[in-house]
């Protein structure tokens, strides 16, 4: 910390002690507000200076917030007070709030202090709506000065590490998180109206399942048991489908022990939903309708800007088989490739990076990820994923090499994963056994055998469609945020 900052903190500590010596509580008590900054502007800004003067008797208000600017000398001064909704100017005069409060509270007030004001509305000569203070109350003394003259943090990493400072100084950041909350609320509203039931399932699992990812491992001391933080919500929700809860969803945290990037955080928020008697076509329709609804309700339009690109959520979304997508981009037709050896040869010919033990389906997926994925800017459903990478999805009845699965891509990123759920317990066991072979060959993200889940399927699960959406990435898209850290209040940061 700079010498200047240390000096400022020392002065603030001295002011704190002076307040205590005067018998003033520098950290205040309950303060009743009558309005927020935005409410005052909505109610009073339409009136002229003269009209407000005539309405002074009926414009008594009380506001509270953080002191963001302060100016003026002598017996009067102006300041801006900020709350969640914005800023409002206040005007403080000694002959209005009293000599004692003016000298002890107003004159010693620092930027960052939290204050309460009671007064009346008026407009200045320049036409700015303001509150003429009748009382001025200190609610919390700030012992540290705000960074960068309160114009916002310039150090991006500091914004993430000290989100509270970012929220104080950056209204755009605050609005992003308000919008995040609204997005999740509209998601709930949409699903509740569709008859879905919101549920809660365990975050600590005995088997890490439901996705291809490395788990975080923990230990239950009393039971002497190894547990895994969930990498997906899926398998517990499908047990509920077996139990007769026909339309369920959960919004919750998921944990994956993987890298950190602009698109990945070790803990993130997902929604997973499952609907009995539906298939992946129904879930495509639901996904498209729900995302469009959220954009329209929260932002007033189903066309959004992302990184200077207009994303059209309003028009019908493209639906493309993964084989056709690869063929369009590379000319390679995986319908005509009949063996792993042919797939490996095609990969070598087109410079596709593959690893040992990859089979037909893995190689098709590598073609897609390396040649197609980043080109999918407008909303596109890619469906028909190969069976090797879809251990929980139902086989396509017309071509068992593929599954009834889709992923949603927008701005070159995956935003959703869904399929017609595999409800055949015999097939499911065979898929898990194939995953165990992959694990033995070095794929540490392959799925474990889950006997309890197979037992649940043996009681009978109806045909079911399921969906998972990464909420953080959806918020990134809808708020035009370049990094996942911009939409997580407290993203993971490497320790200093």
Curated annotation (Swiss-Prot):
Keyword presence, GTP-binding: no
GO molecular function: ATP binding; catalytic activity, acting on a protein; lysine-tRNA ligase activity; magnesium ion binding; transferase activity; tRNA binding
Enzyme class: ligase
Gene3D superfamilies noted in UniProt: Bira Bifunctional Protein, Domain 2, Nucleic acid-binding proteins
Keyword Protein biosynthesis included in the entry's annotation: yes
Binding site for Mg(2+) 1: 407, 414
Binding residue positions for Mg(2+) 2: 414
Family of the protein in this entry: Belongs to the class-II aminoacyl-tRNA synthetase family.
Protein name, as recorded: Lysine--tRNA ligase
Species annotation: Staphylococcus haemolyticus (strain JCSC1435)
Top-level taxonomy: Bacteria, Bacillati, Bacillota, Bacilli, Bacillales
Gene giving rise to this polypeptide: lysS
């Amino acid at each position: 910390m700079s010498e200047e900052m240390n000096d400022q903190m020392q002065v603030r500590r001295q002011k704190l002690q002076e307040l205590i010596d005067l018998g003033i509580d520098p950290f205040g008590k309950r303060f009743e507000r009558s309005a927020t900054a935005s409410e005052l502007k909505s109610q009073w800004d339409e009136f002229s200076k003269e009209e407000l003067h005539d309405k002074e008797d009926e414009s008594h208000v009380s506001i509270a917030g953080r002191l963001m600017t302060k100016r003026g000398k002598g017996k009067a001064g102006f300041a801006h007070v900020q709350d969640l909704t914005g800023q409002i100017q206040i005007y403080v005069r000694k002959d209005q709030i009293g000599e004692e409060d003016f000298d002890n509270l107003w004159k010693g007030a620092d930027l960052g202090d939290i204050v309460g004001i009671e007064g009346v509305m008026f407009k200045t000569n320049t036409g700015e709506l303001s509150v003429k203070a009748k009382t001025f109350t200190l609610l919390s003394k700030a012992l540290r000065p705000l960074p960068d003259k309160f114009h916002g943090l310039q150090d991006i990493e500091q914004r993430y590490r000290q989100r509270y400072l970012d929220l104080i100084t950056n209204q755009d950041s605050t609005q992003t998180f308000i919008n995040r909350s609204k997005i999740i609320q509209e998601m709930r509203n949409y699903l509740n109206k569709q008859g879905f039931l919101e549920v809660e399932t365990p975050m600590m699992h005995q088997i890490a399942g439901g996705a291809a990812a490395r788990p975080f491992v923990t230990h239950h001391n009393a039971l002497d048991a190894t547990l895994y933080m969930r990498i997906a919500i899926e398998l517990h929700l499908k047990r509920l489908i077996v139990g007769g809860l026909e339309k369920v969803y959960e919004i919750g945290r998921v944990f994956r022990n993987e890298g950190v990037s602009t698109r990945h955080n070790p803990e993130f928020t997902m929604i997973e939903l499952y609907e009995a008697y539906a298939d992946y076509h129904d879930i495509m329709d639901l996904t498209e309708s729900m995302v469009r609804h959220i954009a329209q309700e929260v932002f007033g339009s189903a066309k959004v800007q992302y990184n200077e690109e207009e994303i059209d959520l309003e028009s019908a979304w493209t639906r493309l088989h993964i084989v056709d997508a690869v063929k369009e981009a590379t000319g390679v037709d995986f319908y005509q490739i009949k063996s792993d050896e042919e797939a490996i040869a095609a990969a070598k010919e087109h410079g596709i990076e593959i690893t040992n033990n990859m089979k037909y389906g893995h190689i098709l997926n590598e073609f897609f990820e390396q040649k197609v994925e980043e080109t999918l800017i407008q909303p596109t459903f890619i469906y028909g994923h190969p069976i090797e990478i879809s251990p929980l999805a139902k086989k396509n009845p017309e071509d068992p090499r593929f599954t009834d699965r889709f992923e949603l891509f927008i701005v070159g990123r995956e935003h959703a994963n869904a399929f017609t759920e595999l409800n055949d317990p015999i097939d499911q066991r065979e898929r898990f056994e194939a995953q165990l072979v992959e694990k033995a060959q070095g794929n540490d993200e392959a799925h474990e055998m889950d006997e309890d889940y197979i037992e649940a399927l043996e009681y009978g699960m109806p045909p079911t469609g399921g969906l998972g959406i990464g909420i953080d990435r959806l918020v990134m898209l809808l708020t035009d945020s370049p990094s996942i850290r911009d939409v997580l209040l407290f993203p993971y940061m490497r320790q200093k």
